[in-house]
């Protein structure tokens, strides 16, 4: 019976891993004072009658630590790309040079660094909640399986302990990622 239930636990482990991965993606979009192509991943551009991701209309490169270059493929979309970057809330001011946009990354102020730390903390807390929700779902499913007679009580308790270990591990990885990101944000 235990072998039949193991895939259930691996399914929950996968969901917890996805929460940690999602956090790392969200952290990639936080500006740290260093140029990063992922900084513009969330930018959406009004082009061709619809809203499109920036990477669908241009290529993004990082030639220097404090500069991002955006090469727009269609000259008619350059103004839309510039507007989208300015409106993104990242505090960036692109300089248009033909079909290219040069985006200098200004150093962050102390106040902005503190704000970014708070935002990173919120992202981490959202993913911790997601992990705890997965734990709750797993425990509910285990109790249901016990009630239906698929597993014994001692097996359920053993599996709940395993689910708790998976939860603790995922939350530990989230905390480590947050600590790393906060350190990165505060470096001048």
Swiss-Prot record:
Assigned keywords, A-Z: Cytoplasm, Protein biosynthesis
Gene Ontology cellular-component annotations: cytosol
Main location: cytoplasm
Subcellular location: Cytoplasm
InterPro entries (UniProt xref): Ribosome_recyc_fac (IPR002661), Ribosome_recyc_fac_dom (IPR023584), RRF_sf (IPR036191)
GO molecular-function terms, A-Z: ribosomal large subunit binding
UniProt xrefs under NCBIfam families: frr
Protein name, entry field: Ribosome-recycling factor
Origin species: Caulobacter vibrioides (strain NA1000 / CB15N)
